[in-house]
């Protein structure tokens, strides 16, 4: 099977895209939340869905620990937030990870407690015991999803219809968890199924199709395959000269947005908004830098306001990645001009914009620090500016 370039996949996962300066689409995204001191207590309980079959539960958080139980794919397990101090390198579904272990208990067998590798656990809830979702209903959904073959396009529609039938009255944390399970299933179809092959081989694309997709003007009913993709929860994206399917978050929002908790609603609406425009193409930034700054600040404030959000790892990555791009650029959108080695005007403008509009944010503080170095260097690329950017990349990667 042909695969999408890894850099493009990473960019799409972290940041779907928002609207650029030239567009005025009303996406319905919420304004950046006000940065307030965290007022939520540390979660009493975490719930996770097991994403790998026969996942070992060990008595110690390492590969040498004795296996006390094997968790089934789709099983819901509970934990109190205890994380191992050590990390281990493990390859799951051909993807290498270096992650810690979580201490969890099987909800099927209360006597089965131990350490499970965290990369094989998908968090679906973090909060108090009193507001946790119905584990039986989540287990039923998770179990049903395991029966659907991810390599068959029709599985998307089956999953969506099951959720609509079974969770029509769900609200709050139950709706949050159901959304996560459904989105993760569709994402597995996107990345591990054969959908890329379908769009490469089954459609004779017309020349203007790519531009229509970029402008949100493509009619998904145009071809039998694209009509089927839409019915099964997918939309089209363009990148690196290819047309490929991704999960359509607008479809998820249509069902879940008025059911989920307020933080999840903000998260969902922002992700729908960002998916309107892919921020990258061919290694370059293709949205306005001021739009990218707005997104970075949204996620910074969101993370401050929701310190225990169930998808905190993802939202922190979004914040850090966007901040990194704004200060170090990308392969084909460089901070320093390739020929004269001076700061590109677009970056100088957005840094000034950030300093004026987003006073007090971490982004503004980082920009102020770097622009001070740039000013001393005459806005030229020097060993000092390069050293700062290298250290900044390392700091962001280690957070």
Q: Whereabouts are the PLM-identified features?
A:
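C-terminal motif of bacterial Sec signal peptides marking the signal peptidase cleavage site
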Residues: 14-17
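Bacterial signal peptide processing site
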Residues: 19-21
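A cross-kingdom marker for long, charged
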Residues: 324-325, 336-399
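Short solvent-exposed coil/turn linkers within tandem alpha-helical repeat scaffolds
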Residues: 64, 169-173, 250-263, 302-314, ...
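N-terminal mature-domain "stem" immediately C-terminal to a signal peptide or N-terminal signal-anchor/transmembrane
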Residues: 36-39, 44-56, 63, 127-184
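Acidic/His-rich structured neighborhood in mature extracellular/periplasmic domains
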Residues: 170-300, 309
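SH3/SH3-like (including bacterial SH3b) beta-barrel domains
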Residues: 59-82
């Amino acid at each position: 099977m042909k695969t999408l370039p890894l850099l493009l996949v990473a960019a799409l996962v972290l940041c779907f895209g928002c609207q650029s300066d030239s567009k005025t689409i009303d996406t319905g995204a919420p304004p950046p939340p006000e940065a307030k001191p965290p007022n939520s207590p540390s979660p009493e309980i975490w719930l996770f869905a097991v994403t790998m079959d026969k996942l070992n539960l060990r008595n110690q958080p390492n590969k040498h620990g004795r296996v006390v139980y094997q968790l089934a794919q789709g099983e819901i397990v509970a934990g109190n937030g205890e994380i191992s101090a050590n990390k281990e390198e493990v390859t799951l579904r051909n993807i290498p990870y270096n992650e810690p272990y979580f201490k969890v208990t099987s909800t099927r067998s209360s006597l089965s407690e131990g350490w499970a590798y965290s990369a094989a656990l998908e968090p679906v809830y973090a909060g108090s015991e009193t507001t946790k979702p119905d584990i039986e209903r989540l287990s039923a959904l998770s179990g049903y999803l395991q029966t659907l073959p991810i390599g068959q396009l029709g599985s998307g529609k089956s999953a969506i219809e099951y959720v609509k039938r079974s969770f029509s009255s769900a609200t709050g944390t139950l709706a949050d968890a159901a959304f996560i399970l459904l989105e993760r299933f569709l994402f597995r179809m996107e990345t591990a199924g054969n959908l890329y092959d379908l769009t490469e081989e089954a459609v004779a694309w017309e020349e203007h199709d790519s531009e229509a997709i970029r402008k949100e003007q493509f009619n998904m009913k145009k071809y039998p395959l694209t009509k089927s993709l839409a019915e099964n929860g997918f939309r089209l994206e363009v990148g690196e000269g290819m047309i490929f399917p991704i999960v359509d978050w607008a479809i998820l929002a249509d069902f879940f947005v008025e059911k989920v908790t307020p933080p999840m609603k903000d998260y969902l609406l922002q992700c729908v908004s960002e998916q309107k425009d892919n921020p990258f193409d061919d290694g370059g930034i293709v949205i306005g830098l001021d739009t990218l700054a707005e997104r970075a600040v949204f996620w910074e404030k969101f993370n401050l306001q929701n310190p225990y959000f169930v998808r905190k790892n993802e939202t922190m990555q979004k914040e850090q990645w966007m901040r990194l791009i704004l200060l170090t650029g990308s392969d084909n959108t460089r901070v320093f001009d390739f020929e004269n080695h001076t700061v590109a005007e677009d970056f100088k403008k957005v840094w000034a914009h950030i300093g004026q509009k987003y006073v007090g944010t971490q982004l503004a503080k980082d920009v102020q620090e770097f622009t001070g170095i740039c000013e001393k260097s005459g806005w030229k690329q020097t060993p000092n500016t390069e050293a700062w950017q290298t250290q900044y990349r390392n700091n962001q990667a280690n957070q």
